[in-house]
Amino acid sequence: MKEFLAYIVKNLVDRPEEVHLKEVQGTNTIIYELTVAKGDIGKIIGKEGRTIKAIRTLLVSVASRDNVKVSLEIMEER
């Protein structure tokens, strides 16, 4: 699932080499922490959040077949 998410995100941004994805696992829960270049955050969020909602919907669909809850968080670069 991590590779699937990375593939989607890297094809949306201008700087795919700056895409970093961290997977934090809990009991039946996976949290993905996504970090992208500052200029690419808007592309990931999309107009009115539509792009990030679509990405999250895809993740939930893929995770549901494994009975796992999944969450995607966009982390701010420091």
Curated annotation (Swiss-Prot):
Primary localization class, coarse: cytoplasm
Highest taxon of the lineage: Bacteria
Name under which the protein is recorded: RNA-binding protein KhpA
Signal peptide residues on this chain, from the entry's feature table: none
Protein keywords: Cytoplasm, RNA-binding
Entry-linked InterPro entries: KH_dom-like_a/b, KH_sf_prok-type, KhpA
Record-level GO cellular component terms: cytoplasm
Subcellular location: Cytoplasm
Similarity comment: family membership: Belongs to the KhpA RNA-binding protein family.
Span of domain KH: 29-78
HAMAP family the UniProt entry points to: KhpA
Taxonomy of the source species: Bacteria, Pseudomonadati, Chlamydiota, Chlamydiia, Chlamydiales
Short name of one Pfam family: KH_KhpA-B
Functional description taken from the UniProt entry: A probable RNA-binding protein.
Gene: khpA
GO MF annotation list: RNA binding
